[in-house]
Amino acid sequence: MFIPKQFQITDFEIMKEFINENSFATIVSTEHGRPIATHVPLLIRQIEREYYITGHLAYTNPQWKTFEDNKQVLVIFQGPHAYVSSSWYSHENVPTWNYQSIHIYGKAQLMNEQELEEDLILLLQKYERHRKNSIIWEKLSSKTKRQIKGIIGVKIKINEAQAAYKLSQNRNEEDYQSIIDHLYEETDINAHQVAEA
């Protein structure tokens, strides 16, 4: 991903936090030279000394069959984004778009059933733990658990991580503050999240 230096984030701890907060991502691979993508909730996990992006695809989704032939796949995590009007600047200029995004590159591997079950347990814990009647794997019926046969687990070893936080850091202090103030005035929740970033 092209990232001007002032928008680059290199701290992996910041990236991990962002991925945890924006975990619905896009996995991109190629099949016969054509890009294909799937949108899925993913986890970032440390397994032994390496970091992986983990998740699952429907067994009927043909993308998982491309992973063996792809030396690398791309995973895109998109955060909040918002239009920035040039009317918010103290001088004439062009409008822009502010956003946060992370690109992960790595080799995708299929999980065995035990690894997949462990990943599903963690996924349920992440999204259910704060709920009043939370669902946990151990309490699911064997009939429900058998639905695991309909999905394929995937783990992507992180070889490279790129993060872009384009948040008007290149503007002077007056314009920067004006942008934040105007973003808070927008009705779009994304604009508020960009202002808070």
Residue ranges and their predicted role:
Residues 2-26:
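Short, basic/aromatic recognition patches
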Residues 110-197:
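C-terminal edge-of-domain segments
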